[in-house]
Curated annotation (Swiss-Prot):
Its main location: secreted. The gene is PRNT. One of its GO terms (cellular component) is extracellular region. It comes from Homo sapiens (Human). Residues 1-18 form the signal peptide. Specifically expressed in adult testis. InterPro entries: PRNT (IPR029172). Glycans are attached at residue 44. It is found in: Secreted. This is Putative testis-specific prion protein. Keywords: Glycoprotein, Secreted, Signal. It comes from the Eukaryota. Transmembrane segments: none annotated.
Amino acid sequence: MQHSLVFFFAVILHLSHLLHLDASIHPFRLPFSSKPFLLIPMSNTTLPHTAWPLSFLHQTVSTLKAVAVTHSLWHLQIPVDCQACNRKSKKIYC
């Protein structure tokens, strides 16, 4: 059985800008870049990030990375620090 998750948009920020934020974040490296970035999952719900079950976050790491790869491929250039990617992502299966 395949589970699908849809992320409506994602914010990609440099590590140094997120050290003080209370959010569910996942460090990884973007393609074509040697800089480490963090991906914060966003949705159209009103639930805060801290309300997400920990098991849900662990299960979605690969999907979050796939979303970041999708966004980075849409932008031919590497996102600059604090640039938000607000394009709607396509459904990604994991």
